[in-house]
């Protein structure tokens, strides 16, 4: 009940903010003429892009942080979320804290996928038609020591794609993120897993992650001109971001969380697949990267985190980063039993 009330409040606030977005459009861009020609012109003009980015940082946003299990997000209103952006727990590999309900500790792979399905099903229901579930995930490498003397890769990314397809999502082409990661987290034993240097038959190092694109079937949205202008991506960034292989975005520090993803990556994805004023859901909030990105770029957000330690870290981080960078974000925190 508390979650439903909070979510309803957030959606009412979001609707009010969307209705007033025109006041944040820079005056010099307020009279654009034909949007079909004006938007590309703005995207190629560096000064216009700077004006828009400064304006977006002033858009009021609302963020609900819930300490609870995302396998039960029943309080979310159907079709109330425009984008789901998350990085789910890694099956058995990452060093998660010992908290009740932690999916990363489920030992059976098929059961792990079934538990994830409970989350994806509710994401599907919460998404608007045409909305996307974007899932940042890497495959799981098992060393010889932990897998009966056999090197094995468990294809977590393809398992999630197949399960999401069966739940009703449309699979779209993923982005391949080439990242520099900490090999100690990829496999126990370090170099012994990768094989002997300079000799044949070594094992290829696992240094990519997949950014999966799962789309809920439905039409394409037609936001008003103010929303379009405030959501414009520069021509330079559009060319760099909308390609299938990403490099140059380094992995985030694992000091506070075993499987973080960098703020730059989250900011890109928030801007690529949502509009200013939209609501972004992260069912595995961790330390709050998705929420910080949403707040910075004029989106509302909802986050769930089951681990009380990470939840507190997320609260602290989001409070600090939103207050230091901009003062238009309103944060709501609650526990869901």
Place the predicted regions along the sequence by residue.
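Core catalytic lobe of class I
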Residues: 2-34, 54-313
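Extended, non-core accessory segments
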Residues: 38-39
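Intrinsically disordered, low-complexity PEST-like regions enriched in Ser/Thr and acidic residues
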Residues: 42-54
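Short, conserved SAM-binding/catalytic segment
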Residues: 51-60, 315-329
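Conserved SAM/SAH-binding loop
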Residues: 68-72, 331-336
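Short, flexible loop/turn segments with low-complexity composition
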Residues: 224-230, 325-335
